[in-house]
């Protein structure tokens, strides 16, 4: 074993040295593990976070003494070593110590051309990255003696001194430059965006150079043993003769493939012993480092050197497969596999994604409200979208904002783009429920509906029928049809979900409005439906006409007649829902929206309605104007409709109970959950409950069948949260509707907040968009008060949230800590929510095991 050198400022990377990722960074620790495994790693020295911070402040280590650790005045490289691989760092600098004398020595040993190329590359990198000179001054053609002389002259001309010849000075300047780059404002902001703390430290690794250039078999390459896209076993990478670093990855036709390939020569054919040795190293790393690694290597005169190893780059899909495979092979535990998959990354597996290898012509940006990507023709109206869909043409519904009237157009479209809106706007909520990629709040665009043109910030415009791509994952709109990657709901995904379900200790339900939504919820193993919005069932053409007849009825008898015709349709929907869910709980929210949402807009729509109802246009117009409200969100909707027009809730309750009897007769017993929306007072619950109980009693008598049901309240007004104790006395459950509760608590419109929300978050007014992440201080306090007061009166009451916050990992953490029984979110967010909940359980008592070296 080599003698250990341990100085105050730096530590030789040897098997027994005191090196830790928390003090020296992941790269230093990984190199030590490679040394312990017996891999051929060039001599390396680690500088701690503390040392690098001191260097940034002006205290330099004794670099001459540091260089004395290396044999025979070797050239060295400096590599960054942050605590987390994702946090990045300054770029690696190679060939430190290169000067006139070393150039002459290398020319004798390896030839003039190789030595000149090394020297020129170092002068260029040192001048631009260390001395911070203009890169244009050092652009050259052929790397020959003339180019080297010109580069040295350019440096001397800019710096008023010759290029430094002292290796110790070169190393000092490189260390200072990299340390200060890490401490810079832009670098700090960049790593904070990746989750690093503001005071995250940087270590540096000084490593002897394995040249990769010279006589004999020389070159450099990168190898990994799994596919970056799928995670399946596959040797990938490139090797470039007479090269250094990662040059092989950008070398084009000059680089060798690694395995035999019909497209050209390979490392396996040219250097079979080197290839076989790399495969052995890969197997050792996987088993002992407990990870799939990417290895950077150099071949120097036929000898293989391993310079670096990092976790293999991977897509979210590949990460799931890799984590599951490592657990299946007994290398890591199932719990570790779960913790290695970020919950939010699952969104990329559930929807098509833009191929990261393709070109992105971004024409607009907004809020990525529903993940995934889709390409299609622009459609400015729901009618146009339906027409295109009927012809088999994928289309993108482009609207200033969507309303319930656009439901059919959204069903016909493959994606949605709106100028206005935020994370809980109509387009966002429905988009997530339908699994449609959706970008909202794209305030830089302008839609001219009359001219049927979409204008984007760079001056271009798109007409109806033009093709665009919507990337709801990144919140971008792209010109044309770009290449997409298909979803990856394979066996490994389902295995990971099964492991998460075994750990998860809070219920995960889905928001589902139709039988199709329920089938999707079942496909993701949701534990029930936490929110079924019944109003979405009324927008089909035949039902919409009946709804409008009911709205324009002159008497209660006429309203009841129209509702009587809607009853079998609603009952059939509920029978389907109950049958699909097979005895799992289904929570049905009674009718909620204001009635005017079911009326057409514009004179032509009103005229068609007058024809359909056989009434004068003037009467239709007058009644429509009378239904209009100044602030419909706070107007005649929810329980207020149920009290003033009780026939609506009577019909819905009867449909639910008759469906319960029918579905229970042919399948698993059904215990429906009925939820009253927009409650703010105990008396509202009492009035609605008495009528629903009466309907239930009538159905029991008529059908001769007994059944049970649960009645609860959707807590979405601040007053309902504050008075939850007295409301709980009449409720089996309290489900917090956090979308509207956030709106009312903040006094914000979710449809308009996107116009200023980014500025508010950037300026620190809000830490996060409160429509995206549950506000723990304001809205969260109302949830805690409501939960506490509700359970103080009724300890067994069920508590949940059913707003879109239910699929957010941070919000799930809040609900779990508050003792909620379940969360409910859109079907496509169920896998994300389940994994996030599993993470919370595992993180409470888990520490990640170290590598086995």
Language-model segments: what does each one mean?
Residues 489-492, 499-853:
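Conserved alpha/beta-domain cores
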Residues 1-2, 442, 782, 815:
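ATP-binding N-terminal substructure of ATP-dependent carboxylate-amine bond-forming enzymes
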């Amino acid at each position: 074993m080599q003698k250990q050198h341990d100085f105050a400022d730096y530590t030789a990377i040897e098997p027994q040295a005191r090196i830790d990722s928390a003090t020296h960074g992941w790269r230093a620790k990984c190199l030590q593990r490679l040394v312990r495994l017996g891999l051929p790693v060039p001599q390396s020295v680690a500088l701690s976070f503390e040392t690098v911070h001191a260097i940034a402040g002006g205290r330099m280590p004794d670099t001459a003494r540091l260089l004395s650790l290396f044999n025979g005045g070797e050239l060295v490289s400096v590599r960054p070593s942050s605590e987390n691989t994702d946090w990045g760092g300054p770029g690696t600098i190679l060939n430190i110590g290169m000067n006139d004398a070393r150039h002459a020595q290398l020319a004798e040993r390896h030839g003039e051309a190789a030595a000149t190329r090394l020297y020129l590359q170092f002068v260029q990198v040192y001048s631009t990255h260390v001395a911070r000179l203009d890169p244009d001054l050092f652009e050259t053609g052929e790397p020959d003696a003339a180019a080297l002389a010109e580069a040295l002259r350019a440096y001397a001309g800019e710096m008023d001194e010759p290029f430094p010849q002292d290796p110790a000075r070169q190393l000092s300047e490189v260390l200072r430059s990299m340390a200060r780059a890490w401490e810079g404002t832009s670098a700090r902001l960049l790593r904070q965006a990746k989750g690093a703390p503001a005071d995250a430290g940087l270590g540096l690794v000084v490593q002897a150079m394995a040249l990769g250039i010279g006589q004999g078999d020389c070159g450099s390459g990168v190898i990994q043993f799994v596919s970056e896209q799928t995670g399946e076993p596959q040797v990938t990478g490139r090797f470039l003769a007479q090269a250094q670093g990662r040059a092989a990855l950008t070398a084009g036709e000059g680089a060798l493939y690694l395995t035999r390939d019909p497209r050209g020569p390979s490392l396996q054919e040219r250097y079979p012993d080197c290839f076989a040795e790399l495969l052995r190293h890969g197997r050792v790393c996987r088993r002992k480092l407990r990870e799939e690694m990417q290895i950077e290597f150099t071949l120097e005169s036929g000898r293989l050197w391993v310079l670096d190893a990092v976790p293999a780059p991977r897509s979210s899909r590949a990460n799931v497969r890799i984590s599951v495979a490592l657990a299946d092979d007994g290398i890591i535990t199932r719990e570790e596999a779960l913790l290695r998959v970020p919950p939010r990354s699952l969104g990329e597996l559930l929807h098509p994604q833009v191929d990261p290898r393709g070109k992105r012509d971004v024409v607009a940006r907004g809020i990525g409200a529903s993940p995934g990507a889709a390409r299609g023709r622009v459609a400015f109206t729901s009618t146009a979208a339906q027409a295109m869909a009927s012809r088999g043409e994928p289309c993108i519904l482009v609207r200033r904002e969507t309303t319930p009237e656009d439901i059919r157009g959204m069903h016909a479209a493959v994606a949605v783009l709106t100028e206005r809106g935020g994370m809980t706007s109509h387009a966002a909520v429905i988009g997530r429920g339908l699994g449609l990629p959706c970008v909202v709040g794209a305030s830089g665009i302008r839609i001219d509906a009359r001219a049927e043109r979409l204008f984007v910030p760079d001056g271009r415009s798109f007409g109806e029928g033009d093709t665009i791509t919507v990337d709801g994952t990144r919140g971008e709109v792209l010109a044309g049809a770009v290449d997409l990657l298909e979803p990856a709901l394979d066996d490994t995904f389902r295995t990971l979900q099964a492991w998460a379900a075994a750990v998860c200790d809070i219920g995960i339900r889905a928001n589902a409005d139709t039988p199709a939504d329920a089938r999707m919820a079942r496909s993701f193993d949701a534990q029930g439906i936490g929110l079924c919005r019944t109003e979405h069932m009324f927008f089909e053409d035949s039902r919409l006409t009946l709804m409008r007849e009911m709205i324009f009825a002159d008497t209660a008898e006429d309203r009841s007649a129209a509702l009587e015709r809607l009853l079998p349709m609603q009952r059939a929907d509920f029978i389907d829902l109950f049958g699909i869910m097979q005895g799992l709980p289904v929570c049905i929210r009674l009718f909620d929206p204001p009635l005017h949402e079911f009326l057409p807009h514009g004179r032509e729509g009103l005229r068609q309605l007058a024809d359909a109802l056989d009434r004068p246009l003037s009467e239709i117009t007058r009644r429509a104007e009378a239904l209009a409200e100044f602030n419909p969100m706070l107007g005649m909707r929810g329980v207020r409709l149920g009290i003033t027009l009780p026939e609506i809730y009577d019909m819905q309750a009867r449909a639910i109970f008759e469906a319960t009897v029918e579905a229970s007769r042919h399948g698993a017993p059904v215990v429906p959950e009925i939820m009253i929306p927009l409650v703010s007072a105990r008396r509202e619950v009492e009035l609605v409950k008495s009528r629903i109980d009466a309907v239930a009693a009538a159905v029991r008598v008529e059908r001769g069948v007994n059944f049970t049901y649960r009645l609860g309240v959707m807590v979405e007004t601040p007053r309902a949260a504050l008075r939850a104790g007295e409301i709980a006395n009449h409720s089996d459950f309290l489900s917090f509707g956090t979308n509207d509760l956030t709106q009312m608590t903040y006094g914000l419109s979710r449809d308009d907040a996107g116009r200023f929300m980014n500025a508010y978050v950037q300026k620190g007014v809000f830490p996060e968009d409160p429509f995206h992440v549950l506000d723990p201080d304001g809205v969260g306090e109302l949830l805690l008060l409501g939960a506490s007061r509700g359970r103080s009166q009724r300890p067994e009451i069920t508590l949940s949230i059913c707003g879109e916050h239910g699929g957010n990992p941070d919000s799930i953490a809040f609900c779990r800590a508050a003792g909620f029984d379940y969360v409910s979110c859109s079907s496509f967010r169920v896998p994300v929510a389940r994994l996030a909940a599993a993470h919370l359980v595992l993180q409470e008592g888990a520490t990640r095991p170290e590598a086995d070296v």
